[in-house]
Amino acid sequence: MKPVIALVTARAARGLDEDEAPLAAALRAAGAEVAIADWDDPGVSWESFDLALLRSTWDYSERLSEFLAWVERVSRLTTLSNPAAVVRWNTDKHYLLELARAGVPTVCSRFLEPGADAAVGLDSFLAQLEEPELVAKPAVGAGSRDTHRYRRQSRAAALAHVRQLLDAGRSVLLQPYLGRVDEYGETALIFFAGVFDPTTGVKPGARGGASMDVLHFDHAVRKGPMLPGPRDEHANPEVGARPLFVAEHITPRTAQPDELEVAARALAAIPHEGLLYARVDLIRDAADAPVLLELELTEPSLFFGHSPGSAARLGRAVLDRARSFIL
């Protein structure tokens, strides 16, 4: 019997996910039936799939409660990857505090919650900021929407942005802008479930057969700087006025040993199991040491086009997982 796989997207992302076609082709070549389904389509019978794979559900941050309710419901009807517990944990960037407490080198992160005094919170952060620029972003967000960088002297513009987010009921994440990214870019390391890779030492990620027990490193890419130059005092925060995602400049990259080590520590600190895929986004600090910027476990782009065979490798992991649940 052919496994039936859903690649889960969003209506707004149709035609935008460059990973979708190669992954669907790889799954079909490996003997699966594949359907592309919008997560919020009421006409989809999720119980008809052996596995639903989250891919380009890029509008979730605007509808988080609705999306998480859907995740819970669908996880009772079929195998959802990544699992519901992982998605709940990963869709709010407060997880960065948990990883930092676990000893993972992480970009310094300060959160302001709705109801907080925006000016007091921002000024407290600026008083401790050593870098000349900062980044302000929503704690729940995707595609760099509503994310801007500011010079520390552009306090008024940063404060207007922070206030707009807080007034909309959104938690705010403040971080230093690490200028090394302008030259070196980000390093995105992609991991798939599969056979143990002794070069990374990543912990087991799921119960089950050998092919499901471990996340292993597959490939890496360089992501060019995503944020434009710092905004000035007269900038309109434009919260809510943005495209689905910010375009990225992607090129292949060879992951360095120190980057693999930090990625392994980040993955080992995840408090949930059952992952099929993960993307670890790192940048380098002023001392040229890699630090975690984000851990993408929900709907990351996996950049198959920059690593021949990577779609097929994830496809095999998907089918291994699906077949393990087929009676």
Regions found by a protein language model. Name each.
Residues 151-266, 270, 291:
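Phosphate-binding site of ATP-dependent enzymes
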Residues 1-81, 86-90, 94, 117-120:
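ATP-binding N-terminal substructure of ATP-dependent carboxylate-amine bond-forming enzymes
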Residues 40-42, 175-180, 280-283:
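Short, solvent-exposed loop/turn elements at beta->coil junctions and helix N-caps
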Residues 49-54, 187-191, 288-301:
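A short beta-strand motif that forms the metal-chelation/ATP-contact edge
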Residues 2-9, 15, 71-76, 85-184, ...:
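Active-site nucleotide/adenylate-binding loops and adjacent lid/helix of ATP-dependent enzymes
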Residues 12, 59, 141-142, 179-180, ...:
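Short, solvent-exposed loop/turn segments at secondary-structure junctions
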Residues 255-327:
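ATP-dependent carboxylate activation and anion-phosphoryl transfer catalytic cores
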